[in-house]
């Protein structure tokens, strides 16, 4: 009887240890998932100011502009060059954020929404650069056209004055 009791206790203890080990494994998996989720949310919180800044940069490069003088266009061109310079200065922050996000994605427990945030960051960064460069090209082209128009207007004015001067001689 004593042996049966010992065998029964050993069986119960083995069973208990097995369940404990199994539960510990699940607990560790859950802890890893929670840690990955926490890091992902922390990353998206850190990403928010950069995303807002990129949106502002895009809006600076896409808002409607009206200019009809070379000097005004030149001022807008200088402002756009500053936007491009600011984008270039933020490149390090963008690269660090992108790298951090990609590193977080290597964790098998990383939440799926993290990839969409990284994709959106990359897409917006590319758009900000493209829009800023396109706007600068447009302004440079517009500046050349306005300078040519200004030169043509001066030539026409000179021709008109000459014509009027010659007409008054007759």
Give the positions of each predicted feature.
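Extended alpha-helical rod segments
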Residues: 1-170
């Amino acid at each position: 009887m004593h042996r049966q009791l010992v065998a029964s206790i050993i069986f119960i203890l083995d069973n208990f240890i097995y369940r404990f080990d199994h539960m510990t494994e699940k607990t560790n998996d859950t802890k890893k998932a929670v840690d990955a989720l926490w890091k992902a949310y922390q990353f998206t919180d850190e990403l928010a100011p950069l995303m807002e800044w990129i949106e502002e940069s895009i809006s600076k490069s896409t808002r409607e502009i009206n200019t009809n003088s070379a000097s005004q266009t030149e001022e807008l061109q200088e402002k756009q060059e500053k936007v491009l310079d600011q984008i270039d200065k933020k490149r390090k922050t963008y690269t660090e954020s992108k790298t951090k996000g990609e590193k977080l994605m290597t964790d098998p427990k990383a939440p799926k929404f993290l990839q969409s945030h990284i994709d959106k960051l990359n897409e917006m960064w590319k758009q900000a650069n493209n829009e800023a460069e396109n706007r600068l090209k447009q302004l440079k082209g517009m500046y050349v056209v306005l300078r040519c128009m200004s030169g043509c207007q001066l030539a026409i004015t000179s021709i008109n004055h000459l014509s009027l001067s010659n007409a008054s001689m007759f």
